Amino acid sequence: MSHTASTTISRYFTNTRGKALSTGWFGLSTAEFLMPVTIIYALTIMDWRNIWIIISVAIILFLPLVSYFLVKEVKLSSREDNNEVIKENIKQWKRSEVIKDYRFIIIALNMLAMPWIATGIFVYQSFILSAKNWGEYTIAQSFMVYSIASVLTLFVAGYLIDKFTSRKLLIYMNIPFLISLLILIYFQSPVSSFFFLGLIGVSNGFANVLGSSTWAELYGVKFIGSIKALTTALMVFSTAFGT
């Protein structure tokens, strides 16, 4: 769903693409803020299997209705057809051309670093809790800081992308993530968990927006769907490899 949403937004918006993408990702980040605490509370009153059943039924019942009412009045058109002023003439790259471009390889490796490493951290968080002697709910509580940082960064990133372009922001994207890993290595206090996950949230906020806007800036939007499909597949592989 996130792939479809970000691709559609990248095609539809031009001059305000950064802000539009940051708004689109707001829902996911909000869920990341609310769901960990909600699930922990739910586990105290019911079995985890029942929780999955409730979530599945809720999605089946409400997602089609919500989707229908949100998009029924929207006429989606591509960047080439909408009324925004196009400031630059970008070559429309096909996916077969993109994979031969050295810039794609360099940028993709930069973007894949965080999902690769962070997924490993999230999957083995119980080991981190044990190794650090943190409380049982320390990381779950820290995920709220992660989500807040991610949401705030989304809107900052959207503004900065529209002002400075994605290419100029890419080099800064993983710096907070690097600092978070250093905190994880060298600090033992439970408080450090909040800084650790908060900084990951900052990088995540940048990555969510840059992961779509960068490709649109570099390669145009005519074939952005197939390009995003490739990068999303690489991201999924990197998360599996990270574990």
Outline where the language-model segments fall.
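Helix-loop-helix hairpin linking two adjacent transmembrane segments in secondary transporters
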Residues: 24, 28-75
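Helix-to-loop junctions at the C-terminal end of transmembrane segments
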Residues: 153-165
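Extracytoplasmic gate region of multi-pass secondary transporters
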Residues: 96-155
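Cytoplasmic helix-loop-helix junction between adjacent transmembrane helices
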Residues: 1-26, 220
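Structural signature of the two symmetry-related core transmembrane helices
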Residues: 168-183
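A late C-terminal transmembrane helix in Major Facilitator Superfamily
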Residues: 23, 32, 218-243
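Flexible cytoplasmic inter-helical loops of multi-pass small-molecule transporters
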Residues: 71-93
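Paired small-residue
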Residues: 191-199
